[in-house]
Amino acid sequence: MAEEPKETGPGFQNPVAGFGVTFKAMFKKRLTEQYPEQQKTTAPRFHGRHQLNRHPDGLEKCVGCELCAWACPADAIYVEGADNTDEERYSPGERYGRVYQINYARCILCGLCIEACPTRALTMTNEFELADSSRANLIYTKEQLLAGLDDNMVDSPHAIYPGMDEQDYYRGLVTEAAPGTERQVAVSKGEKPQDEGVEA
């Protein structure tokens, strides 16, 4: 009959070995970062604040499909889609994201929403300073998330590029706003033709 191995207790050596790691760390140079005075640059593919992208002519890429909201494990994204009209067009397709909100009190910056987006409308920037003392300020709206306008862009809503359709936008055939493109009146947002800076 084989002898059973004797069970050995934790003994005295295990706690000493654990404290040995702590004791060694006491004499190492501390790596203190002087933040925010000295900020390190983030990696190019850093997962920071989200951004809603635009087409080269200024129309929005978001089509209000809500796939990003379904993919979010923290339930931090709220999207409400609406239909485009010829009088008020925000994206080249049939629909656009009328309401878009991201709650950064819940968001874990995992990037699953980016992978789910079929139009590459949603990407992540390198901005990471999102802390705020108010929970309400941590809910970013579409206006806060929407990318800025470049020189060859016209703010939405406006008509699509003449002679182009939705597929041409996604093929990259539209590279700038058509000459003479003017911003349409956003009636859904309460604008009127006589509002300053808005033309009928």
Swiss-Prot record:
It comes from the Bacteria. [4Fe-4S] cluster 2 binds at C72, C107, C110, C113. It is found in: Cell membrane. Residues 181-200 are annotated as: Disordered. One of its GO terms (molecular function) is 4 iron, 4 sulfur cluster binding. Residues 52-82, 98-127 form the 4Fe-4S ferredoxin-type domain. One of its GO terms (biological process) is aerobic respiration. Gene3D superfamilies: 3.30.70.3270. Its main location: membrane. Its EC number is 7.1.1.-. Residues 189-200 have a biased composition (Basic and acidic residues). NDH-1 is composed of 14 different subunits. Subunits NuoA, H, J, K, L, M, N constitute the membrane sector of the complex. Belongs to the complex I 23 kDa subunit family. NCBIfam families: NuoI, PRK05888.1-3. NDH-1 shuttles electrons from NADH, via FMN and iron-sulfur (Fe-S) centers, to quinones in the respiratory chain. The immediate electron acceptor for the enzyme in this species is believed to be ubiquinone. Couples the redox reaction to proton translocation (for every two electrons transferred, four hydrogen ions are translocated across the cytoplasmic membrane), and thus conserves the redox energy in a proton gradient. This is NADH-quinone oxidoreductase subunit I 1. It comes from Streptomyces avermitilis (strain ATCC 31267 / DSM 46492 / JCM 5070 / NBRC 14893 / NCIMB 12804 / NRRL 8165 / MA-4680).
